[in-house]
From Swiss-Prot:
Bilayer topology annotation: Peripheral membrane protein
Catalytic activity as recorded in UniProt: a quinone + NADH + 5 H(+)(in) = a quinol + NAD(+) + 4 H(+)(out)
Identification of the protein by name: NADH-quinone oxidoreductase subunit D
Protein localization: Cell inner membrane
Enzyme class at the top of the EC tree: translocase
Entry's family note: Belongs to the complex I 49 kDa subunit family.
One GO cellular component, as annotated: plasma membrane
EC number annotated for this UniProt entry: 7.1.1.-
Molecular function (Gene Ontology), one example: NAD binding
InterPro entries for this protein: NADH_Q_OxRdtase_suD, NADH_UbQ_OxRdtase_49kDa_CS, NDH1_su_D/H, NiFe-Hase_large
């Protein structure tokens, strides 16, 4: 009798999470192996937003290549422009005027707040808190207005340029940003009241996706992901660029390495960015002068000068048709973007186009740990883990 009973073999259930899923944060496709509702294995499939950015850049001049960086992590555009501009400046051997550097710091920190506002509020939405996302988008709108006033675009700014920034800030903008920084701490406090001690939010995030200090280093984490695990690593302090060493700010560090710790790190980073913005505005008020290098072979002449000088008109025409030639060489330049270390490995062969531009996206290193972080958690917890990673597929797929 016993011999006739077929042995039952229990196999894990395979399911697709995304790419059309509200919590996938873009076009993430996860192939999950489930034991009931517990994740045994998570296999992220990337490439659905691949546009060949690195190859396209090889066919563009250095000026034409810069706008591609806005379209990578499209919720924090100016940070990536910053990395490419610094890399090109390093190869050219030029130094940006002090006022231009302060404007870059100012808008890098506005970008950090823009990014964290979106991440924290949509992270709340992922785990069931709807109100923060409605508040967050309203607040981001005010910051996007600053983007628009300085560059003409709300998202794809194309404002940072090798040699400085495109134009100086328009009259009245500094006062409006200062006024915003006075109101912003109240908004952060309100957001803090909604989420930080919220019982349901803590149940969904505490002890979920725990990454130890050693594991965070081994997986190549950076930004809030590594700081949430207790490693005080921030390129603005460790390898200062564009006068960050003149600014006074703290690096928030978590202790538990879970989703909740990463949330707290981002909350405090918004407060620190507000401090940095105020310091940058104070320094700008005392620092008149040019915002880009006075080299007509690299930076285009002012419009008024082009109407008076034939030489300026020729420079402008040559810059926007042929571009400038960058001396042969290579450099790896990284900035502390809102998501972590965003790096550009730029190789020049002495022509007017990059020979190779390798982009080190921040989210790629974080997403590769998805299997490690979600193993043994419930299906609903993978949503919280993805939200705490702050991934955007524009930069991961490139």
């Amino acid at each position: 009798m016993g011999n006739n009973v077929a042995e039952t073999q229990i196999k894990p259930f395979t399911m697709n999470f995304g790419p059309q899923h509200p919590a996938a944060h873009g076009v993430l496709r996860l192939v999950l192996e489930m034991d009931g509702e517990v994740v045994q294995r998570a296999d992220p499939h990337v490439g659905l937003l691949h546009r060949g950015t690195e190859k396209l850049i090889e066919y563009k001049t250095y000026i034409q290549a810069l706008p591609y960086f806005d379209r990578l992590d499209y919720v924090s555009p100016m940070s990536q422009e910053h990395a490419f501009a610094l890399a090109t400046e390093k190869l050219l051997g030029i130094t940006v005027p002090v006022r231009g550097q302060y404007i870059r710091v100012l808008f890098s920190e506005i970008t950090r707040i823009l990014n964290h506002l979106l991440n924290i509020t949509t992270f709340g939405l992922d785990v069931g808190a709807i109100t923060p996302s409605l508040w967050g988008f309203e607040e981001r709108e005010k910051l996007m207005a600053f983007y628009e006033r300085v560059s003409g675009a709300r998202m794809h700014a194309n404002y940072f340029r090798p040699g400085g920034v495109n134009l100086d800030m328009p009259a009245g903008l500094a006062d409006d940003i200062w006024e915003y920084t006075e109101r912003f701490p109240k908004f952060v406090a309100d957001l803090n009241n909604l989420l930080t001690e919220n019982r349901i939010f803590k149940q969904r995030t505490v002890d979920i996706g725990v990454v130890s200090r050693a594991d965070a280093l081994a997986w190549g984490f950076s930004g809030p992901m590594i700081r949430g695990s207790g490693v005080p690593w921030d390129l603005r302090k460790a390898q200062p660029y564009d006068r960050y060493d003149e600014f006074d700010f703290d690096i928030p560090v978590g202790s538990t390495g879970d989703c909740y710790a990463r949330y707290l790190v981002r909350m405090e980073e918004m407060r620190q960015s507000n401090r940095l913005i105020r310091q940058a505005l104070e320094k700008l008020a005392k620092t008149p002068g040019p915002v880009k290098v006075n080299d007509r072979k690299i930076a285009p002449p002012p419009r008024g000068e082009m109407k008076r000088s034939m030489e300026s008109l020729i420079h402008h025409f040559k810059l926007y048709t042929e571009g400038y030639h960058v001396p042969a060489g290579e450099t790896y330049t990284a900035v502390e973007s809102p998501k972590g270390e965003f790096g550009v490995y730029l190789v020049s062969d002495g022509t007017n186009r990059p020979y190779r531009c390798k982009i080190r996206p921040t989210g790629f290193s974080h997403l590769q740990a998805m299997d490690f972080m979600s193993k043994g958690h419930m299906l609903a917890d993978t949503v919280a883990i993805i939200g705490s990673m702050d991934i955007v597929f524009g930069e991961i797929d490139r």
